[in-house]
Curated annotation (Swiss-Prot):
Biased composition (Acidic residues): 468-491
One Pfam short name: MA3
Name under which the protein is recorded: Pre-mRNA-splicing factor cwc22
Classification lineage: Eukaryota, Fungi, Dikarya, Ascomycota, Pezizomycotina
Molecular-function annotations in GO: RNA binding
Record's keyword annotation contains Secreted: no
GO biological process: mRNA splicing, via spliceosome
Family: Belongs to the CWC22 family.
Domain MI residue range list: 507-623
GO cellular component: catalytic step 2 spliceosome; cytoplasm
Length: 1010
């Protein structure tokens, strides 16, 4: 114990206990893992202690209960080599222990092991020892530093960085530009750049005069123009155009044209839309349209040289639609077409067909000569060129499209017709002109006057879009805006939205239809409909629904007619609405099927029959071949049949004859052209209402007929008759005589069989004759016709009285036009013919191949032929020389000049008796077969040969083939003496038409008019 008690007394008073110090009063600046703070000092190595080594958990047997902190040998840097398992604190290089005096020799060293238990569980250290001090020992002094060598550790101060120099704005902009340029270069190399970095750098660049800012604006312009062009369509073109003008199109016109060409080549069906967009821009900025046309033409030229079919097709289609919009003159389209068709190949013809389909209607309207030339070239290629069958079919389809008036290829669609014709500016650019495409406009170039140009375009944009006036109006509205005006605007917008949806109109129609269908009789239906509150201006919808309800029924219901009559009789407003609906439905009647058409016609027929609407509505009907369709003709037929059924034929005719209605009926019963008159007559005759056309028939019969000009007498001539009221025929006549007499026109005008008396025979067949005449006492006539054979052959013998006095021959009435050539030989010294007796011998052969025209009105058919006063005067005086060659045969002969219809060829050889006057002067031509011989009874022999290419005359009883062989004595009267001459005539003809000898009226009563 003594040794134990003395050991603490030997120690230094400072070593026994720690005096309170700031470091001892505060917790140790160790981390929770036991390491010390860097500020603590590392204690010096303690002196050797001879006392045996104590375990970490062993305490010193000091009587004082005070705990002292001392470093164990494990905690010292130079620990005993026998120390085992050092704690982690001894291995930490940053651990620094507090220096404390080591215990003296012989005194046990007190150790406190803090690693055995956590700090949270260890009791707090005692600050002061509770035990009294040892005897004979002064109390230990209390120092703040708790030892002579203890000093608080100073914290190491980090060196302050040098002050950063503040950059100026110019330096910041320079750095941003450099960074932006670096990023652009990286992006051009394919490196991905985050968009936010680019946006941040772009926001930092604000100087508009710099190259980087203008390049950013150029990229934004390019992106915007390209996006607007790509999203345009028919529905939004009106909204895209203002946005497009919002961009600087003068600066970006190259970009705009480039985007248009790319988009059009990629999507050909949108070509009309792109052409319309270009036309709108061309009205305000002509340089844009001109640049587009130049690039298109240059593009076509390059593609044509490279044989690039796809680019040629797209370019020609775009040019065609620009021509339709009048952006470029149509001459460029004509030049391209002629270039493609100059050396036709399958591809070039296909491109030309596509171009012509698009621009054909415009060329037909504006330049018909170009269109005709192009189609002639197509026709030649189709017939002569060696092209593929597919290409031939394409040309045939093109001709069919032309025949259909380009119904599927209009010039401009209605929804794209946004440019007024007078506002359009047309450029004239030829296919062979020198063209500058201005490719430099596609790339970025720095503009030193960038701000000035932008200001100028802003002014131009304000003029185009009217922004200035709009801004002023907006300012005024803002100054005077109130809550009431805002509410009115909202209500107006709401109403506009409702109008666009047509919901109210659909509901109104549904209500009207249900009211009609739920009614038992017309009065109830009218009462229900009158109770409906129709919106203002929607009265026409009620009328339309009544007609539509009637049309959709399977059969016509009189219920609907009575309902319409009830409304039409209410007041004048409803009557006018029904009359307007009549005109509307007649103009659109071709849209309805036959059953609906029938119901609508009977509905309006009921309204007209009951006088619910005025009959002046017939003014909208024009009954002719051009202005009617099959549907409209069916509508008129059913309408008039219903009128006839309701009011009767007599009343209908009387109503149609009223003077007050005649102006309104001019379209149904026309009096303008014979063609329209005949069409109306035939139409009403076909629907068994010919009695309505009596007045038109009379008018048609009395219409003046154009007269033919008289040809010269001593020359070969041709006369062509104009169209008469029935039909048109052309006639040619030529006469040449080989006799000593003058050349004259030989005509035989006959419609009746031969009779006595002085008369001129009339025929409808012109003849061309050359005559040489010799007269004999006997005549034989043979006629051969090249027409289908007749059904029967008839032989007859009958007396044929020749004409009296002048000796003119009479032919049967012939309805077939003929052109005859006859040769008559007349010897110089013919035997004299005795007074009052003469004979001719003729042989005639005729061929006919033409349909015979109907007889003209007013010609005598049976009986004595009319004789003109001039003929009587010439016969009485005997001084007038009759010239010409006449043949007495039953072959057709020419009509008078003013009645000529059609010329045909006839060649005949005839021998026939020629009646002459006994007291006529010598050398006078008194017969029709040739000139008569002088007095003394000389005989004249006549040969005539005729060939007729026309069908023989129509007959009353006989049709088909007919062969007539006749022998008849012909009494000849001259100077009150009657002589007989015998003529033998034989005719054979084949005809495909009927012969009629009786008179035929030009318009049969209530029959079809040809």
């Amino acid at each position: 114990m003594a040794s134990a008690d003395m050991s603490p007394s030997r120690s230094h008073p400072h070593d026994a206990t720690r005096s309170p110090s700031p470091r001892t009063q505060s917790p140790s600046p160790r981390d929770e893992d036991g390491s010390r703070s860097p500020g603590e000092r590392t204690p010096s190595p303690p002196s050797r202690d001879p006392s045996p080594y104590r375990s970490p958990g062993e305490r010193t047997p000091s009587p004082s209960p005070r705990r002292d902190r001392s470093l164990s040998p494990r905690d010292q840097p130079h620990s005993h080599p026998r120390s085992r398992s050092p704690t982690p604190r001894s291995q930490s290089p940053s651990r620094r222990s507090v220096r404390s005096p080591s215990p003296r020799q012989g005194s046990p060293a007190r150790r406190v092991d803090r690693s055995s238990s956590p700090r949270a569980r260890s009791p707090p250290p005692r600050r002061h020892s509770r035990s009294p001090p040892l005897r004979g020992q002064p109390p230990p002094p209390r120092h703040r530093d708790a030892g002579g060598d203890y000093r608080p550790v100073r914290k190491e101060r980090t060196p302050t960085p040098p002050p950063v120099a503040v950059k100026t704005e110019e330096e910041k902009l320079a750095d941003a530009r450099a960074e932006y340029q670096k990023l652009l270069n990286l992006r051009s190399q394919g490196v991905y750049l985050p968009p936010h970095r680019l946006r941040a750098l772009q926001a930092a660049i604000t100087d508009k005069k710099t190259r980087e800012y203008q390049r950013m604006a150029w990229e934004a312009l390019k992106k915007s123009v390209n996006g607007l062009v790509n999203k345009v369509n028919t529905a939004n073109i009106k909204f895209v155009v203002p946005e497009l003008f919002g961009e600087n199109l003068i600066r970006g016109r190259g970009l705009f044209c480039q985007s248009l060409l790319k988009a059009q080549h990629a999507s050909l069906p949108f070509t009309p839309i792109y052409a319309c967009l270009a036309a709108i821009c061309n009205t305000k900025l002509p340089q844009v349209g001109e640049l587009l046309v130049k690039r298109l033409v240059l593009r076509f030229r390059k593609a044509f040289k490279r044989n690039d079919k796809a680019v040629c097709l797209s370019s020609t289609m775009f040019i065609a639609h620009l021509v339709n919009n009048q952006v470029v003159h149509e001459m460029i389209a004509a030049q391209i077409l002629l270039l493609l068709l100059a050396k036709p190949t399958d591809d070039s013809v296909e491109i030309a067909v596509g171009l012509m389909r698009e621009v054909g209607l415009f060329l037909e309207e504006m330049s018909p000569a170009i269109a005709h030339a192009v189609f002639d070239q197509f026709r030649n290629i189709l017939h002569e060129a060696d092209i593929d069958r597919r290409t031939q079919y394409m040309i045939e389809v093109l001709f069919q499209v032309r025949k259909d008036k380009y119904k599927d290829n209009p010039v401009i669609k209605e929804e794209l017709d946004l440019v007024e014709e007078e506002d359009q500016i047309t450029h004239r650019i030829g296919l062979d002109d020198e063209i500058d495409p201005q490719d430099g406009l596609n790339v970025f170039k720095m503009d030193p006057n960038w701000e000035e140009n932008e200001e100028e375009y802003k002014k131009l944009k304000a003029e185009i879009l009217g922004e200035a006036s709009d801004d002023d109006e907006d300012d005024d509205d803002d100054d005077e805006s109130e809550s009431g005006s805002e509410s009115e605007d909202e209500e107006q917008k709401a109403l506009e939205i409702k109008d666009q949806s047509n919901a109210d109109l659909v509901n109104l129609r549904r209500t009207i239809y249900l009211s009609i269908q739920s009614s038992a009789d017309p009065e109830e239906a009218a009462h229900k409909l009158m109770k409906l509150r129709l919106p203002a201006g929607q009265e026409a919808e009620l009328v339309s629904m009544i007609v539509e309800s009637c049309a959709q029924e399977k059969v016509y219901l009189k219920f609907m007619g009575l309902l319409g009559e009830r409304f039409a009789r209410l007041n004048r407003m409803w009557m006018d609405l029904f009359e307007e609906s009549f005109a509307k439905y007649y103009s659109t009647i071709h849209r309805y099927e036959t059953n609906k058409l029938r119901n609508i016609a009977r509905f309006f027929g009921h309204l007209l029959a009951t006088d619910a609407i005025g009959w002046h509505v017939f003014s909208v009907i024009h009954l002719n071949e051009e202005e009617t369709t099959s549907a409209s003709r069916i509508f008129i037929k059913i309408l008039f049949e219903d009128l006839q059924e309701n009011i009767g034929s007599a009343k209908l005719k009387a109503r149609m004859s009223e003077e007050t209605l005649q102006p309104s009926l001019q379209g149904i019963f026309p009096h303008d052209e014979p063609r329209n008159i005949r069409f109306s007559i035939n139409y009403f005759t076909s629907i068994k209402m010919g009695y309505l056309t009596d007045e038109m028939r009379t008018f048609l019969a009395n219409m003046p007929k154009p007269a033919l000009p008289a040809p010269p007498a001593d020359s070969d001539s041709e006369s062509v008759s104009s169209y008469s009221s029935y039909s048109s025929y052309s006639s040619r006549s030529r006469s040449r005589s080989l006799t000593p007499r003058k050349d004259t026109r030989g005509r035989s005008l006959s419609r009746t069989p031969p009779r006595r008396g002085r008369g001129r025979s009339y025929s409808r067949t012109p003849s061309r004759s050359r005559s040489r005449s010799r007269s004999y006492s006997r005549s034989v006539s043979k006629s051969v016709s090249r027409s289908p054979p007749r059904r029967r052959a008839v032989e007859s013998r009958s007396p044929s009285p020749p004409p009296r006095g002048r000796g003119r021959s009479y032919d049967r009435y012939s309805r077939s036009p003929s052109r005859s050539r006859s040769r008559t030989r007349s010897p110089a010294a013919a035997p004299p013919i005795r007074r009052g007796r003469s004979g001719t011998r003729s042989r005639s052969r005729s061929y006919s191949r033409s349909p015979s025209p109907p007889p003209a009105r007013g010609y005598p058919t049976r009986g004595r032929a009319p004789v003109s006063n001039n003929d009587r005067a010439a016969a009485a005086s005997g001084k007038r020389r009759r010239e010409g060659s006449y043949s007495a045969s039953r072959s057709p002969h020419p009509p008078p000049q003013q009645r000529l219809r059609r010329g045909s060829y006839s060649r005949s050889r005839s021998r026939s008796p020629i009646p002459i006057r006994g007291n006529g002067p010598a050398g006078r031509d008194t017969g029709r077969a040739g000139p008569a011989p002088a007095r003394g009874g000389r005989r004249n022999r006549s040969y005539s040969r005729s060939r007729t290419r026309s069908p023989p005359p129509l007959a009353d009883a006989a049709t088909g083939s007919r062969r007539v062989v006749s022998r008849s004595p012909s009494p000849v009267v001259g100077n009150n003496k009657r002589r007989r001459s015998y003529s033998s005539s034989r005719s054979r003809s084949r005809s495909s038409s009927r012969s009629r000898y009786r008179s035929r009226s030009p318009v049969a009563k209530r029959g079809r008019v040809d």
